[in-house]
């Protein structure tokens, strides 16, 4: 009986020590940004994360538009004043533009770049 009780205590201690590590690893990298008059506010023009990171890009805009994260093929439709998020796991290393689609005439243009490092 003593061995199983000791083993159970050791297991409980080990799980208690590992719990914070599991919680920390699952926390997403969150970036909050806004696009006002066609310009990016609240972030640098390049965001850097590590491959395997959970990422959340939170957006607001003063006009309707669609944002497209190339390489991951994620699109989000933004409405004025309504927060929108792109949530994904950064599985592909490289440099990827987030482009504005449908916010006026002319070619699509990047508002920022996402760099995913191995």
Regions found by a protein language model. Give the residues of each.
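Histidine- and aromatic-enriched segments that form or immediately flank copper-ligand environments
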Residues: 60-80, 109-114
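Beta-strand cores of secreted/periplasmic/IMS beta-sandwich domains, seen most often
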Residues: 45-63, 85-91, 96
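N-terminal secretory signal peptides that target proteins for export/translocation
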Residues: 1-4
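Extracellular/periplasmic metallocenter environments
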Residues: 28-29, 78-118
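Sec/Tat signal peptide C-region and signal peptidase I cleavage site
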Residues: 21-25
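N-terminal post-signal-peptidase region of extra-cytosolic proteins
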Residues: 37-47, 69-72, 81-85, 98
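N-terminal edge beta-strand
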Residues: 26-54
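Bacterial N-terminal signal peptides
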Residues: 10-20
């Amino acid at each position: 009986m003593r061995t199983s009780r000791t083993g159970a205590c050791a297991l409980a201690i080990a799980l208690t020590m590992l719990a914070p590590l599991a919680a920390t690893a699952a926390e997403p990298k969150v970036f909050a940004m806004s696009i006002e008059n066609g310009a990016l506010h609240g972030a640098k023009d390049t965001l850097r994360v590590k491959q395997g990171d959970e990422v959340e890009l939170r957006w607001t805009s003063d006009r309707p538009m669609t944002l497209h994260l190339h390489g991951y093929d994620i699109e989000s439709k933004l409405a004025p004043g309504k927060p929108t998020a792109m949530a994904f796991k950064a599985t592909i290393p490289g440099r990827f533009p987030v482009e504005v689609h449908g916010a006026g005439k002319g070619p699509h243009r990047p508002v920022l770049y996402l760099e995913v490092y191995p």
